[in-house]
Design a protein with these regions (language model features):
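Sec/Tat signal peptide C-region and signal peptidase I cleavage site
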Residues: 17-21
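Extended, low-complexity, intrinsically disordered C-terminal regulatory tails
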Residues: 25-26, 30-33, 79-109, 180-201
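Catalytic cores and adjacent binding grooves of peptidoglycan-active enzymes
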Residues: 26-28, 136-285
Length: 285
């Protein structure tokens, strides 16, 4: 091969994450073996040594498995499995949305976070403990919204105390750093709970009306993991929450044309993610 051509190909052979961009991460078939390590932040990071959540387990079932987004740090896998067991003991089965890709990194659609193996989406909708959905059902069933956004109120006909129990179970887990829910759901919890201390971890955010997003804190043995700012003290049932609900209601009453967000770029990933991305036996296509 002429030297000039080799020089042109060299950047590709080196495999920088900026060159390969986000879609390269979604083409990886397997986690990187070895001790678990979280690198970077929730929105610009990757994970080595991830585990795969079983598609069906005691009290849980993975939804949209064709996306291949059911991987996470072993602490995240353990949390989901424990929540599943406790939900099964109450007669239910959790439906699990996206965790991370096999080695984390940016996804081509759906999320800006979920990059470091510490995030999981859990549907509010549950199934009876003994019902296992077919593969077609896991790909096709839609997540029902639990709010009436134009009214700024919870949809009481869909909401169940079981959903509150799942939220509280996650919030009381010490490894959980925060949980994102729609502000209308948090407002309803602020009104219904007598002991609101656990609501500190439950944070209002856009969307999240059909699922809640659980985020773990950085593991102590992952020195390259970048944490978020700590949550302010208090239960969060305050004027700021009122403003959140007002803004969500106004947005629903006067909707703007939907603009699909650009997929997150790989340019912001830490340099250490290069080795995670480019190690052998990674590619499925």
């Amino acid at each position: 091969m002429p030297i000039r051509c080799l020089a042109l190909l060299l950047p590709l052979l080196l495999g920088s994450t900026s060159t390969l961009a986000g879609n390269a991460w979604s083409a990886i078939a397997y986690p990187l073996s070895g001790s678990p390590q979280v690198i970077g932040s929730y929105t610009a990071g990757c994970v080595a040594g991830a585990g795969a959540l079983p598609l069906v387990g005691e009290g849980h079932q993975v939804m949209r498995p064709s996306r291949n987004r059911y991987y996470g740090h072993p602490k995240l896998i353990a949390l989901v499995e424990r929540m599943g067991r406790e939900t099964a003991a109450r007669g239910g089965r959790l439906l699990i949305g996206d965790l991370a890709q096999p080695r984390g990194g940016p996804m081509p659609s759906g999320h800006r976070s979920h990059q470091s193996g510490l995030d999981v989406d859990i549907w509010f909708l549950q199934q009876p403990r003994d019902r296992i959905l077919s593969r077609a059902e896991t790909e096709q069933i839609e997540m029902p919204s639990m709010v009436r956004a134009t009214e700024g109120a919870l949809n009481a006909s869909r909401w169940s105390p079981r959903y509150r129990d799942a939220l509280k179970l996650a919030a009381l887990s010490p490894e959980v750093e925060r949980i994102f829910v729609n502000a209308i759901i948090k407002q309803a919890l602020c009104q219904s709970e007598t002991d609101r201390a656990w609501l500190n971890k439950v944070r209002p955010w856009w969307g999240h009306d059909s699922h809640f997003h659980v985020r773990l804190a950085c593991p102590r043995d992952s020195a390259l993991c970048q944490p978020q700012k700590p949550i302010p003290p208090g239960d969060g049932c305050d004027a700021d929450l009122v403003n959140w609900v007002r803004d969500i209601r106004q947005a629903a009453l006067s909707p703007k044309p939907y603009r699909r967000p650009e997929p997150p770029s790989a340019d912001r990933l830490p340099a250490a993610c290069n080795a995670v991305l480019n190690s052998p036996t990674a590619w499925k296509r």
